[in-house]
C-alpha cells in the first residue's frame, strides 16, 4: 500500500480516537467517572480498577481499529534485545492425585550398599520380618521399598555398617509413579476419570520422519486394551508369517495372547520335520512394564523384517518364534487401573484381602513354597502347591501339548524381567547343580551380552541365576551355595528352571532389562526403544548361534569397537528404507480402517 494512503488512514484513525470513550459499552462493563477521574466507587482498591480495566473485553470499535492498524502496518516485530526474550516461567508439573498420594505418599525406595555375607544375611532377615518389598539387587546393592515410618524399625534390625550405607533412590514414589503412566492418561482411569485410549498410528503428525512412523506404538507404555488390537493388526497385515494364538487362560478368564512368527514350507508331500521353536516372554511380574514393551518391540522387528532383512528372513525360515508380551494379563491390567506396583497375578488365595501368586515361583520343578505358604500377602508367595498359579499351569500345559501333539521342538526360552541388566542361565534354585551344557550356556550368554554392548554400549552381566542376586556378597564367589538359598528374591520354582529341566530346552535364559540407575520398575518411556533395540540385537545373535554356533563370534567380532550403536534400519538392504516407509503408511491406513 502506498505511503500516502497509509498516512491518510492513520490520520483518520487518530482523529477518531477522542470518540472512543463515547462508544457505548456493555452494561456489565460500564464505568462512571467522578470529577477526579477516579471511579465513583472510591472505597475499592485502586489496583482493582486497573485489573478490571485490563480484563475488560475490548469494544467493537477498539477491535476494528486494531485490526485495521495490523492490516496496514502489520504486527510489530520483536527486537532481538533483552526485552524480546521470553520471561522465565516456572515449569508447571501436575501433582499426583489424592488416590496415589494415599497409596504411595509415604513410601520411598532405599538402596543399600552391601559388602559381605553378614550384611546380606542381616538384610534378608530384616526384610522377611518386616515383609518389605525388595525391588531388585545386584552384586553390591539392594533396593527396598518401604514406608518412611518403617525406616527406623528396619535400621534397628541391621548391623551398624548398614545403618549408614543406604541412600534414597526414589524420594517421592507417588509422584514418580504418576509420571510413569502414559501421556494420554497420566494416572489410572480410576484416579483421573474416564478415558478412552486405543491404538492409533495415524495420530502421528505429518511432519514425522519416515523411520519414526514404525515406532509410534513404542513412544509410550501401552495398556492391555491397546496391546491386543495392536497384535491383531499385525496379524492382519502380515498374515503370511504371523499368527495370533492363545497359550492359556488367566485366573480372571482372559486369554494369554501370543504371536507365532515363522515361515513354513509349502510342500506338504512329506511330513514336516519337527519345527524348532524359540519362546520369548515378558510381563511375568505385572509391574515390569519394560519387559512387555521389549517383547512387543522384538516381535514387531521380526515380523516387519521378513523379506527386508536377510538375517531375519533366514531366521524365520529356520525357526518359529512365539512372542508372549505378557504372561500375566490380569496383573498387567491391574497396574494400569489400580496399583502400578502390583507384582503377582490376581488369583484368589486363602486370604481374601491378599490375592495373587508370584508366577515365577509357581512352576513345578524344585518348587519350594514352604517359606511363604503361611503368608499369601508376601510378594513372593508361591502358592500352596506347585502350579497353583493358573497362568503358570496353563502355559506349561500348552508347552507340553506343543511337544507331544504338534511336533514342536523348543530350542530356546527367554524370559524378560526388570531390572539390573543381567543375563541369567540355569539353575536358579541352587548353585549345587550345574547344567550339563554349562559351557554352551556361558558362551551364548556372553555372545548376547556382547551383541547388546555393540548395539548400545550397555553392559549386561552373565551368570547363573542362583548367583544373580548377591553373587559377590558371599565372601567367596566360588562357593557352591551362596546366600541365595534364603535370598532376597527366591528363585525356586521358576519358569527358567522348568523349561530347561522338565521340557529339555537347552538354551534357557532370564534377562533382567534396564536399568541400574535410579528408576527401578518405573523406567521412563524414553528407554522403551533403546531397550527394545539392544535386546532385539541379542535375539538375532541367539538365532544365528542356534543356526551355526561358530557364526556368532565372527558376527560380533566383525563390529569395530569404534562403531556407532547400530540401528535396525542398518540391517536392511539398499532401497528397502523406501519400502519400510511405504509399509508404515499402509500400516497406519489399515489401522484407521480397522478402527472404523
From Swiss-Prot:
Binds 1 zinc ion per subunit. Residues 1-22 form the signal peptide. Residues 220-546 form the Peptidase M14 domain. Zn(2+) binds at residues 285, 288, 417. Glycans are attached at residue 370. GO terms for molecular function: zinc ion binding. Its cofactor is Zn(2+). It is found in: Vacuole; Secreted. It comes from Trichophyton verrucosum (strain HKI 0517). GO terms for cellular component: extracellular region; vacuole. InterPro entries: Peptidase_M14. Belongs to the peptidase M14 family. Inactive carboxypeptidase that may play a role in cell wall organization and biogenesis. Residues 564-583 have a biased composition (Acidic residues). This is Inactive metallocarboxypeptidase ECM14. Its main location: other. Transmembrane segments: none annotated. Disulfide bonds join 354-377. Substrate binds at residues 285-288, 343, 360-361, 418-419. Residues 181-210, 557-596 are annotated as: Disordered. It holds the Pfam family Peptidase_M14. Residues 23-184 form a propeptide.
Amino acid at each position: 500500500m502506498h505511503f500516502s494512503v497509509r498516512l491518510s488512514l492513520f490520520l483518520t484513525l487518530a482523529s477518531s480516537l477522542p470518540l472512543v470513550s463515547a462508544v457505548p459499552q456493555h452494561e456489565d462493563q460500564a464505568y462512571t467517572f467522578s470529577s477526579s477521574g477516579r471511579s465513583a466507587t472510591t472505597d475499592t482498591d485502586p489496583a482493582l480498577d486497573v485489573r478490571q480495566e485490563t480484563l475488560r473485553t475490548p469494544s467493537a470499535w477498539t477491535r476494528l481499529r486494531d485490526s485495521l492498524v495490523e492490516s496496514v502496518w502489520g504486527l510489530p516485530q520483536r527486537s532481538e534485545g533483552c526485552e524480546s526474550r521470553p520471561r522465565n516461567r516456572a515449569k508447571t508439573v501436575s501433582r499426583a492425585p489424592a488416590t496415589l498420594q494415599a497409596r504411595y505418599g509415604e513410601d520411598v525406595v532405599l538402596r543399600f550398599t552391601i559388602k559381605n555375607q553378614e550384611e546380606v544375611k542381616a538384610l534378608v532377615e530384616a526384610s522377611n520380618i518386616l515383609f518389605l518389598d525388595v525391588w531388585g539387587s545386584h552384586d553390591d546393592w539392594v533396593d527396598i521399598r518401604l514406608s518412611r515410618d518403617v525406616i527406623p524399625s528396619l535400621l534397628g534390625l541391621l548391623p551398624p555398617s548398614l545403618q549408614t550405607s543406604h541412600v534414597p533412590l526414589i524420594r517421592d514414589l507417588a509422584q514418580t509413579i504418576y509420571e510413569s503412566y502414559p501421556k494420554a492418561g497420566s494416572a489410572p482411569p480410576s484416579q483421573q476419570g474416564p478415558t478412552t485410549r486405543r491404538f492409533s498410528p495415524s495420530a502421528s503428525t505429518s511432519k514425522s520422519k519416515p523411520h519414526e512412523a514404525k515406532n509410534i506404538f513404542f513412544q509410550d507404555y501401552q495398556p492391555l486394551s491397546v496391546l491386543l488390537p495392536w497384535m491383531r493388526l499385525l496379524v492382519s497385515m502380515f498374515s503370511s508369517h504371523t499368527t495370533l494364538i492363545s497359550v492359556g487362560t488367566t485366573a480372571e478368564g482372559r486369554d494369554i495372547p501370543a504371536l507365532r512368527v515363522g515361515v513354513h514350507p509349502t510342500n506338504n508331500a512329506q511330513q514336516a520335520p519337527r519345527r524348532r521353536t524359540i519362546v520369548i516372554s515378558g510381563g511375568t511380574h505385572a509391574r515390569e512394564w519394560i519387559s512387555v514393551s521389549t517383547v512387543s518391540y522384538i516381535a514387531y522387528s521380526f515380523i516387519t523384517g521378513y523379506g527386508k532383512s536377510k538375517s531375519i528372513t533366514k531366521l524365520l525360515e529356520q525357526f518359529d518364534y512365539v512372542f508372549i508380551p505378557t504372561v500375566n494379563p490380569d496383573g498387567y491390567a491391574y497396574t494400569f487401573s489400580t496399583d502400578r506396583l502390583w507384582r503377582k497375578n490376581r488369583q484368589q488365595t486363602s486370604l481374601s484381602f491378599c490375592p495373587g501368586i508370584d508366577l515365577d515361583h509357581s512352576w513345578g520343578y524344585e518348587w519350594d513354597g514352604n517359606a511363604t505358604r503361611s503368608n499369601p500377602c508376601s510378594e513372593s508367595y508361591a502358592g500352596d502347591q506347585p502350579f497353583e498359579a493358573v497362568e503358570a499351569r496353563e502355559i506349561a500345559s500348552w508347552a507340553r501339548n506343543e511337544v507331544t501333539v504338534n511336533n514342536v521342538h523348543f530350542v530356546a526360552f527367554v524370559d524378560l524381567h526388570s531390572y539390573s541388566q543381567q543375563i541369567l542361565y540355569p539353575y536358579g534354585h541352587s548353585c549345587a547343580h550345574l547344567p550339563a551344557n554349562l559351557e554352551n550356556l556361558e558362551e551364548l550368554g556372553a555372545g548376547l551380552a556382547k551383541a547388546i554392548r555393540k548395539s548400545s554400549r550397555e553392559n549386561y552381566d552373565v551368570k547363573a541365576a542362583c548367583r544373580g542376586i548377591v553373587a559377590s556378597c558371599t565372601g567367596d564367589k566360588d562357593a557352591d551355595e551362596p546366600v541365595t538359598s534364603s535370598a532376597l528374591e527366591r528363585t525356586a520354582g521358576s519358569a527358567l528352571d522348568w523349561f530347561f529341566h522338565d521340557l529339555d530346552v537347552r538354551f534357557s535364559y532370564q534377562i533382567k532389562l534396564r536399568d541400574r540407575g535410579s528408576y527401578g520398575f518405573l523406567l521412563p518411556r524414553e528407554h522403551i526403544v533403546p531397550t527394545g533395540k539392544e535386546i532385539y540385537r541379542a535375539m538375532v545373535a541367539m538365532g544365528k548361534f542356534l543356526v551355526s554356533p561358530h557364526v556368532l563370534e565372527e558376527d560380533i567380532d566383525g563390529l569395530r569397537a569404534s562403531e556407532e550403536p547400530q540401528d535396525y534400519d542398518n540391517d536392511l538392504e539398499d532401497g528397502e528404507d523406501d519400502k519400510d516407509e511405504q509399509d508404515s503408511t499402509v500400516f497406519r491406513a489399515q489401522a484407521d480402517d480397522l478402527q472404523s
